[in-house]
């Protein structure tokens, strides 16, 4: 959530910066609500002052034995008006809050201005795409003989679900273990196991609600007035970031660095017809997430560090990739600045997103009321960052495509062999005649 004081001081400036993000701020509606709020607050303060004055007058009159009934009646009338004003003020504050909850974060000044992914800016590349001396297959054709089973996944749960079997399932697990081990043993993160189902207020904290309810899978139990609504997490960023919700941490405890391997559940409501083949876009997929909670003056150094941590995974796996700075129109709702990592997929002859690392500054912290005690001992909002380290399914896709062999086998990257019992390659199971 944005700082409402920023809007009160520079409404037109905020509106312009939000327009760069593709969001049209209803300046007239905000101004009207603010004017009404100020008028009610001013009137309430006047009534409070008048009531205080009359209360003193009543005390003095009683001391003199004078009749106070008329003054008491006026005090009663003031009380009734104040109750009505408080109710109206509460209504206005709710409307302001609803308006604020729908506003995306303001982009950092270094973010390129643009409308969509076509305006993103490539920062750097690593690795050289492999040259194949045979016809390259995509991960579906490579993986299906090795244990990638889309047919059974669809039979069990519908489109965009996958079953993994045998060595492919083991490779998928090895990738997640390798990522977690790298982040905990080399990058200083604390491994965390989180709930996969969370309460609605948790999603308000990280910005998925109210705007993106259609992208979430909802879980309901009970019935009627006793219905309890919860949601499956779309990323463990949700659970990890909210660990500091409604708390004040000591400055000496920062940075807090957490990582988790979890399934993620997304309805992909706005993705109809996109990436329908294979594992690129699934309703259920695994991801290793990184989250950092830091002091404001350290957040952009932390963003660069986090990007480096995601890059390290790709480098250790020997997968070519590029780093892209997202433009204002392509960033996520809560982000102030985002870098995407895109891995090379030879069958598509292009780079595809495999990680997104974002600094949300105080946007999520303000929604969660997550603070730290600064050097002066005063509570101050933290900055929160999140990044994929990496999406496990898409990394599996990249390994299958980049490490495929002409005979249909897949070479196991050296970094994963300790997690695969020393296995150097995955061959299709022998066909039983």
From Swiss-Prot:
Write out the similarity annotation: Belongs to the class-II aminoacyl-tRNA synthetase family. Type-1 seryl-tRNA synthetase subfamily.
Keyword set, alphabetical order: Aminoacyl-tRNA synthetase, ATP-binding, Cytoplasm, Ligase, Nucleotide-binding, Protein biosynthesis
- Which residues of the sequence carry a binding annotation for L-serine? 235-237, 289, 388
Q: What is known of its domains?
A: Consists of two distinct domains, a catalytic core and a N-terminal extension that is involved in tRNA binding.
State what this protein does. Catalyzes the attachment of serine to tRNA(Ser). Is also able to aminoacylate tRNA(Sec) with serine, to form the misacylated tRNA L-seryl-tRNA(Sec), which will be further converted into selenocysteinyl-tRNA(Sec).
Indicate whether Oxidoreductase appears among the record's keywords.
no
The gene designation is serS
Q: Read off the PROSITE patterns from this record.
A: AA_TRNA_LIGASE_II (PS50862)
Which terms does the UniProt entry file under GO BP? Answer: selenocysteine biosynthetic process; seryl-tRNA aminoacylation
Q: Which reaction does it catalyse?
A: tRNA(Ser) + L-serine + ATP = L-seryl-tRNA(Ser) + AMP + diphosphate + H(+); tRNA(Sec) + L-serine + ATP = L-seryl-tRNA(Sec) + AMP + diphosphate + H(+)
- Origin organism lineage: Bacteria, Pseudomonadati, Pseudomonadota, Betaproteobacteria, Burkholderiales
Q: What protein does this entry describe?
A: Serine--tRNA ligase
Gene Ontology CC terms, in alphabetical order: cytoplasm
Give binding positions for ATP: 266-268, 353-356
Q: How does it assemble?
A: Homodimer. The tRNA molecule binds across the dimer.
> EC number(s) for this protein?
6.1.1.11
GO molecular function: any one?
Answer: ATP binding
Pathway given in the UniProt record: Aminoacyl-tRNA biosynthesis; selenocysteinyl-tRNA(Sec) biosynthesis; L-seryl-tRNA(Sec) from L-serine and tRNA(Sec): step 1/1
């Amino acid at each position: 959530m944005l700082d409402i004081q920023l809007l009160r001081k520079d409404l037109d400036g905020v509106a312009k910066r939000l327009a760069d993000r593709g969001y049209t701020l209803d300046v007239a509606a905000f101004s009207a609500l603010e004017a009404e709020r100020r008028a009610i607050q001013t009137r309430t303060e006047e009534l409070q002052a008048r009531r205080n004055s009359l209360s003193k007058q009543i005390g003095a009159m009683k001391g003199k034995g004078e009749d106070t009934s008329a003054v008491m009646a006026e005090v009663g009338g003031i009380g009734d008006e104040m109750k009505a004003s408080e109710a109206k003020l509460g209504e206005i504050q709710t409307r302001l809050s609803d308006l604020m909850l729908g506003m995306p974060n303001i982009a950092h000044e270094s973010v390129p201005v643009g409308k969509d992914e076509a305006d993103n800016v490539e920062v750097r590349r690593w690795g050289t795409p492999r040259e194949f001396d045979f016809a390259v297959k995509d991960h579906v054709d490579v993986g299906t003989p090795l244990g990638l089973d889309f047919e059974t996944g669809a039979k069990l749960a519908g489109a965009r679900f996958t079953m993994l079997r045998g060595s492919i399932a083991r490779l998928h697990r090895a990738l997640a273990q390798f990522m977690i081990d790298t982040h905990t043993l080399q990058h200083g993160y604390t491994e965390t196991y989180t709930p996969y189902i969370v309460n609605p207020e948790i999603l308000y904290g990280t910005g998925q609600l109210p705007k993106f309810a259609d992208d979430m899978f909802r879980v309901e139990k009970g019935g009627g007035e006793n219905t309890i609504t919860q949601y499956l997490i779309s990323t463990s960023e949700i659970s990890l970031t909210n660990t500091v919700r409604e708390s004040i941490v000591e400055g000496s405890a920062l940075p807090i660095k957490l990582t988790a391997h979890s399934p993620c559940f997304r309805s992909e409501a706005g993705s109809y017809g996109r990436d329908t083949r294979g594992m690129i876009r699934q309703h259920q997929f695994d991801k290793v997430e990184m989250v950092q909670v830091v002091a404001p003056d350290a957040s952009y150094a932390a963003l660069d560090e986090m990007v480096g941590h995601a890059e390290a995974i790709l480098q250790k796996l020997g997968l070519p990739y590029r780093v892209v700075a997202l433009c204002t129109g392509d960033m996520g709702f809560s982000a102030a600045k985002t870098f995407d990592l895109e891995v090379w997929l030879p069958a598509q002859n292009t780079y595809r997103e495999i990680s997104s690392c974002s600094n949300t500054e105080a946007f999520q912290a303000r929604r969660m009321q997550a603070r730290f005690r600064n050097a002066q001992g005063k509570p101050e909002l933290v900055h929160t960052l999140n990044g994929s380290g990496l999406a496990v399914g898409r990394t599996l896709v990249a390994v299958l495509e980049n490490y495929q062999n002409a005979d249909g086998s897949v070479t196991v990257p050296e970094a994963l062999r300790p997690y695969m019992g020393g296995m150097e390659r995955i061959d299709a199971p022998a066909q039983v005649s």
